[in-house]
Amino acid sequence: MFLDYSGYEALTEINSSFGKYVLLLQQFEGCRSLKDRLQMLKDLGREFMIFENLNVEDFRESKNMIHRFYTMVISLRQIMEIGPLVRRSPAVLVVEFDCPVEDCLDELDPLHPLNRAFIFIHKQWTYYHQYYIVEKVKKVILDMAPVKEDDWSILHKVVYSEGFVERRYKKKKYLGDIYIPQPLMKSNKITTISNFSQLTKISNVRVYRFNATAACDPQNLNKKNLSIKELKDKDLPNLIWTLEPEKFYVDMRPYKEHEERKKRREEEAKVRMQGEEQENIMIERKKMDSIEVEASSGLKNIIKTPLANRVVNTFNNCAAVVIGYVTEVDKVKDDNEEKNNDRPKIANDGIAQKSRSESEDNAGTPMENAYFQPEPQDNDQNNISWNTTMKDIDPIYMSERCARVWRKEQQMLGLEKAQTFEKKYCKDQMVMDENQVEEPGKHSERHTKNQVVRPRTKIASSASKNDNSNNKNSKSCKNCHKEEAHGLVREYLKIKLNISPHGERNQRTKDKRKCIMKYNASSNNINKMPGESEVLGSTILTDIHFKDVVTVKFRDFKAKFRKVKINA
C-alpha cells in the first residue's frame, strides 16, 4: 500500500505527460488571502475547480480526484509555469488530519484509487530529499498564490520530527517529511513500506512533533516510545505530499493486517457484551430465585390476553390474599360427577391430605409474604406444541368443543392485538333444589341434593351450534346486556382447569371474610393458609367468570374479589 523512493533519480524520472493535477489545501481561518489569490488566478483564465465545505459523503460519492481528508479541492490542468517539480509530479497535497487515524482506516477502501495514499511518517528520507521537496514546493506555492511570507507561514505546515537534519525558517526549526507514493515510473528502484498504517494511536492530528523512535516496531507504538507534542498554529507547517492516485502500486498487507485487527476488536467487543448480558441474566435469576415459589408449570403457558393474564397471575402457583364474599358449598361424592368429567381426577381424600401437608409447611408464613409471587415466564423451552404447552390436557381425549376453543385460540394468537368478543350476560339462571339448607358454621355431616348449573353465557364468536341449551337460555332471557369480555378465555380456562359446567353442589353459607389461599396448579386445587377463618382444607376450582369483579368458583367456596396484591 505504501511505496517510497530511495534516490534523487525518482524525482527526475517521473513521467511528465500527466494532464491533470490535484492540489488539496486545508481550509482554515488564515487562508483567506490565499483563496483570494486563487480566485484571481481563476479569473485570469486558469482552469480551477474549487470545492469548499465538503463532507465525508461527498468524498465517498464524488468522481473527482479528491480525498476524504480535505475540505477544499482545487483541480489544475495547465500549470506549466508553476515549476518543474509540480509539472513532473502528479499532485501536490497540503494536508491536515481532522479525524482520528484509526477511524479513517476503518472507513477507507484501499481498492479505490483515491484512498490508496495514507499520511504517515517514516524516518528513511535523507536530508537532500526533504530539502529539495520542501524548498521546491514552497517556491511553487509562493509563486502561485501568496504575496507575503506571512501567508506562507500559515499555509506551510510540516510535521516536526527529531532525528532529521534541521532547517530553519524564520529562525524556527522545521522539517519537511514528504512521502511520495508510486507514480508511473521508468525506474525499478521501489521500496515497499508497510509500517505507515500502524500509527493508529494518533487521534485528532493537527501538527505534532515526533521523536526519533517513531520508526520502531509499529505494533509497539505507544505514548512512551512515541513522543507527540502538538504545535500552535503559527508554528505549524503542513505535511506536503505528492501522489498519483491511479498509477501506483498498492501493498495490501497493511490493509489486511488492519482488517484483522478491526475484526478482532469487533469480536472482543461482542464477547464482552455477551458476558455482560449473561451476568445480568444471572443476577436477575438470583433475584427471582430468592422470591420464587417452586411448583409445576401450571397456568404459566396459558393464552396471553389481558383478561387471561389477570387470572393467570392470580392462580400461578402462589399464595394469595383474596378479600371478598366467600360462599361455602358442600362436596358431593356422586358417580354422575365422575361420568361427566372427560379426565380422571385425584381423589378428594388424597388432595385434602396433600393440601394439609402443604399448609403445615407454610404455617410460619406471615401475611405480608402471602401475596402473589408470579413465576418468571419461561415459555421458550415449552412453547413447542400442544403436548408441551398444555400438559394438563391430553389432545387424544380432547372433546370437539375443546378443539374448537383451541383452534380459535390459535387464530387469536395470530392477530395484531388480543380481540374482545361480545358476550351476552344473563341473570343468574341457576336452578337449585333447596330442599335442605343448614345454618352457617355447621360443617359436619352435611348432605346436599343435586344442583343443576346451566351455563351463564352465550359466546357470540365461538361455534355453539351443538350447544342448543345455551341458545334457548339466551333467547328466553329478557334482561340480557352486552359487555366486552373474552368469552373464549373463560371457556378455555374451564376446559384447561378441568371445570365441569354441570357441577353438583349446593349453596350453604355466605358471609364476608378474608381468606388467605394458595393455589396448587399440579393438583388443580386451592389450600387455606393456617390461622384464618374456617374453610375446608382442600378446594377444587370449578368455574371462572369475567365481569367488573373477577368471580372464581371452587369446589368448596366461591370468591368475588376486586383487589389482589402481587409481589414481583
From Swiss-Prot:
<feature type="region of interest" description="Disordered">
    <location>
        <begin position="334"/>
        <end position="382"/>
    </location>
</feature>
<feature type="compositionally biased region" description="Basic and acidic residues">
    <location>
        <begin position="334"/>
        <end position="346"/>
    </location>
</feature>
<feature type="compositionally biased region" description="Low complexity">
    <location>
        <begin position="458"/>
        <end position="477"/>
    </location>
</feature>
<protein>
    <recommendedName>
        <fullName>Uncharacterized protein YKR015C</fullName>
    </recommendedName>
</protein>
<feature type="region of interest" description="Disordered">
    <location>
        <begin position="436"/>
        <end position="479"/>
    </location>
</feature>
<comment type="similarity">
    <text>To yeast YJL043w.</text>
</comment>
